Amino acid sequence: MQKTYPLLSQINSPDDLRLLPKDKLQPLCDELRAYLLESVSQTSGHLASGLGVVELTVALHYVYQTPFDQLIWDVGHQAYPHKILTGRRDQMHTIRQKDGLHPFPWREESPFDVLSVGHSSTSISAGLGIAVAAEKENAGRKTVCVIGDGAITAGMAFEAINHAGSIHTDMLVILNDNEMSISENVGALNNHLARLFTGSLYGTLREGGKKLLSGIPSIKEFVRKTEEHVKGFVSPVGTMFETLGFNYIGPIDGHDIEELISTLKNMRNMSGPQFLHIKTKKGKGYTPAEQDPIGFHGVPKFDHTSGKLPQTKSVPTYSNIFGDWLCEMAERDPKIIGITPAMREGSGMVEFSKRFPQQYFDVAIAEQHAVTFGAGLAIAGYKPVVAIYSSFLQRAYDQLIHDVAIQNLPVIFAIDRAGIVGADGQTHQGAFDLSFMRCVPNMTIMCPSDENEMRQMLYTAYTMNSPVAVRYPRGNAQGVELQPMQALEIGKGKVLKQGEKVAILNFGALLNEAKQVAETHNYTLVDMRFAKPLDEALIAELADRHELLVTLEENALQGGAGSAVNEYLQHIGKIKPLLMLGIPDFFIPQATQAESYADLGLDAKGIEQKILSMK
């Protein structure tokens, strides 16, 4: 490694980084970018975001005394360079793997990871709490939050900015704006103004002038407006953050290491809430990622010398099946509306967005708004379909109850990534949606076992006049033939195999695992289809005819489908041995989906062993 990366091989902590002379920092950035590309291409992971913040990461650790100073990364997709510089360089080949490095900043992994993250827009709220604590303790530590131009659109981020500005706490928020490339002329002007507005002389005059002119409101107001006009001339968005109580600087070139260091050194000594706006290019330094930052956001293993990502498998994903269904329905009904909170690609809605732009809404990272926006459309007689990941629906729970379910509005929730998701770990597992939706009145919840059933359930939801959730897993579908769509009978399961002694009640896409066990031991196998309402008559019949009932689901056992079956059996007074298989009471770490199923006993082998242990 020393031969290929002579500078990076010397950096085992930010302390080593701070020993480098400034003229070595850009060569270090070049090595860091090359190493990041090499390691991610060999292991899979998030690439384009990290490539875009190499200079920023180096500058932050060079200027700030991390981990004494607190550095917080929002979401964490961009934190790979941070991990490399903070003692985890030689472990990068394990990232997102079982027992390897966590895919996001993780408190248990390193003292440099101040906040465990994975979902967006949390950094400023947590950073403000940390900054307030530092002030109360007179610790002298600084707090820096790095947030992207996508994450800052969320309401939570602006709630935190509004609060921070109102209490005037010392902290720095850095907006990593990678939406468009930097204009050379505007970038140069902004770099100059950044040095001016963050310089010690300007800071002294600014604060001193406020005191001197405090008794002369008209002059004080003139000076304030003049300063804002100069800043607004370059970046009108700056006046918004100034209005919220922040001292806004920027935008500046986020790939100019010298300018970043100069600006950050000045800002480190400024008091009150500071806002630095930097412009970066996602995928910087790797042409394929620069040209296709969305495609190279999260990548599988690939040949970085060719820049070609491997072709997807022939079997479509559940997300693709959903997108195709949405297009098919939009051809029939102009009142069907597709809604996504900034997950167009992940939710399979690219084709729909192109073919039906008037029926497609990307509301940005705003899950709460997405749900209530759908409620409004439903009130007006439209058929809204909210396509959302299970773990992100958690952020809109009040809206699901207050704005949709209480009013019994026909909003369809297409819940992607339900169950075990794999390499993204604890923050992204879809483990809780059955539990938190099942207790909500007026909700209908369906759990398809394959893509054909998924289509039938989505169509069934379309025909209903009440809120409906269809939950389906991450990854490739089963490859079954798609049948013409028809509405299912609500709350009715389907006996797939009649056996004896043991009945397996399957909820969702683990059906094939259950089928292997049922065929080996001649057990009864049931595709329950509906988690709410349950097929109560079928459950009672199965309880009468079998010695053991087994429920199988990709959801937390507490409050899930198995709990629903148990509650019903208790309600009718049938005391029957019941084995509930699902996700236990802990957060599931990163691994492949297959590894997690095996660890949790949700593959065929684990299901079989648990059933046999009950007999």
From Swiss-Prot:
Q: Which Pfam families match?
A: DXP_synthase_N, Transket_pyr, Transketolase_C
**How is the cofactor bound, as the UniProt entry phrases it?**
Binds 1 Mg(2+) ion per subunit. Binds 1 thiamine pyrophosphate per subunit.
- Give GO BP annotations, semicolon-separated: 1-deoxy-D-xylulose 5-phosphate biosynthetic process; isopentenyl diphosphate biosynthetic process, methylerythritol 4-phosphate pathway; terpenoid biosynthetic process; thiamine biosynthetic process
Enzyme class of the recorded protein, top EC level: transferase
Required cofactors, per record?
Mg(2+); thiamine diphosphate
Q: Does the keyword Magnesium apply?
A: yes
Question: Which reaction(s) does the protein catalyse, per the Swiss-Prot or TrEMBL entry?
Answer: D-glyceraldehyde 3-phosphate + pyruvate + H(+) = 1-deoxy-D-xylulose 5-phosphate + CO2
Residues annotated as binding thiamine diphosphate: 77, 118-120, 150-151, 178, 286, 367
Task: Output the superkingdom of the source species.
Answer: Bacteria
EC assignment: the record states: 2.2.1.7
Enumerate the HAMAP family for this protein. DXP_synth
Q: What does this protein do?
A: Catalyzes the acyloin condensation reaction between C atoms 2 and 3 of pyruvate and glyceraldehyde 3-phosphate to yield 1-deoxy-D-xylulose-5-phosphate (DXP).
Subunit structure and binding partners: Homodimer.
Q: What is this protein called?
A: 1-deoxy-D-xylulose-5-phosphate synthase
Gene behind this chain? dxs
